[in-house]
A protein has these predicted regions:
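Edge beta-strands of extracellular beta-sandwich domains
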Residues: 87-92
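Amphipathic alpha-helical segments typified by the pilin-like N-terminal helix
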Residues: 1-20
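N-terminal membrane-insertion helices
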Residues: 18, 22-29
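Extracellular/periplasmic head regions of type IV pilus-like filament subunits
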Residues: 27-84, 97-98
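Short, intrinsically disordered, low-complexity terminal segments
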Residues: 10-13, 80, 93
């Protein structure tokens, strides 16, 4: 019965990393917006100055996060999936997960 326990621990670790990554990206977008007046067009626009080079924008399943920018470039949503395959959404607000 050790294997299910390890799977559960691995899933929790992936979910914790996803939560941390979303918070980091939210903060980077906020800093970008403060410097430029709008949100970045793509997450790649954050690399080097706001996010370390080589950062992968992936969710807990290894799939690329989906970044959607509003028409006025002032708001965004960032979506991915947790280790259980449930959608997690961040929009930079204090209640980032739905």
């Amino acid at each position: 019965m050790l294997l299910p326990s390890l799977d559960s621990a691995a899933g929790r670790a992936k979910n914790a990393r996803l939560e941390s990554d979303l918070a980091t990206i939210d903060n980077a977008i906020l800093l970008y917006k403060m410097d430029n007046g709008t949100c970045p067009s793509t997450l790649s626009d954050l690399v080097d100055e706001y996010i370390a080079k080589g950062k992968k924008f992936e969710d807990a399943t290894g799939t690329e996060l989906v970044y959607t920018l509003s028409g006025d470039k002032l708001t965004y949503t960032l979506k991915g999936r947790n280790a259980d395959g449930e959608q997690v959404t961040s929009d930079g607000s204090s209640d980032a997960e739905e």
